[in-house]
Regions:
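Active-site cofactor/cluster-binding pocket
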Residues: 1-162
């Protein structure tokens, strides 16, 4: 049986949860994996909870990450840690704004990409795929600050290794 990597991204409406899952799915596709993605928007337009699941591997059958099976949980808003912690498998990795020193980012709107930067250092996916996916999924004027945020997150990941 081939391993499927399960990732959950959680936050509030307007924080870029879904854009983050778009970038992540793009990276896995570029790496040649079968990718499935799902999202739960809730009251996202009013700042409510938003969750995105990304699963990739050689054969992925369902887009939803089963409870207790997430290898990684990326949380953009600290209040969303506890409501989503049950998604992590034992030994899974939680990545929060504190992990990437969010106060040092070029903009708070780059937090989603900074968390992806941290994740990128923990996954065996080529860095060039991450950079290409960021460029492909964001407007050109946002590339410099998001590429900076990605590298900040990537450097911060040394503290997250399981």
């Amino acid at each position: 049986m081939h391993k499927v990597t399960n990732i959950v991204v959680a936050g509030l409406g307007g924080q870029g949860v879904l854009k983050g899952t778009d970038i992540l799915a793009d990276v896995a596709l570029r790496a040649g994996y079968d990718v499935k993605k799902s999202e739960i928007k809730g009251m996202s337009q009013r700042g409510g909870s938003v969750t995105g699941d990304v699963r990739f591997g050689h054969h992925v059958f369902s887009p939803m990450v089963p409870a207790g099976e997430a290898d990684f949980l990326l949380v953009l808003e600290p209040t969303q840690v506890e409501p989503h912690r049950y998604m992590l498998r034992p030994g899974g990795v939680l990545i929060t704004p504190d992990a990437v020193q969010a106060d040092r980012l070029p903009s708070k709107k780059t937090l989603n990409v900074a968390l992806l930067g941290a994740l990128s250092a923990l996954l065996d996916l080529p860095e060039e795929h991450w950079l290409a996916a960021i460029r492909a999924n964001l407007p050109e004027k946002l590339h410099p600050m998001n590429l900076d945020a990605f590298q900040i997150g990537r450097r911060a990941a040394a503290r997250l290794r399981p």
